């Protein structure tokens, strides 16, 4: 229990020091992507998955994770890259288990590179010239194995918003308060 508290304390200090942790990974290419570790629960090898009829095209299936049935999203396909081929044994595939808005899901990826700490000052918005339909929240440069690489930070919330239908309702009581 003390290890968990220590880990939480370390992550809390990062926020206070204007720093963040990024999980760096690849999507079957040499290019490096990242997501904020704050939302990551665990990284696992690709588990057995079941296909369900009528699921979204970016879902590879559902699996059982710690007693929960969760969707597994093909991140390559979700950000409009070629999907990871489920039969391709040359790609070491993993699943990043995340929690967003009290919803747990997995993102199928290629290889995990590492976890790095970086300063918010080193994070930049993506270039405006790439358009509004991209799935990037930011970009940064990170030293990976002695080489400075451009890392694209994926906007996981945007990916999820395209897959998961959110039921947004406003009660009459709240509407009355606004008037």
Where are these regions (language model features)?
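An acidic, low-aromatic, low-complexity terminal/linker signal
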Residues: 1-179
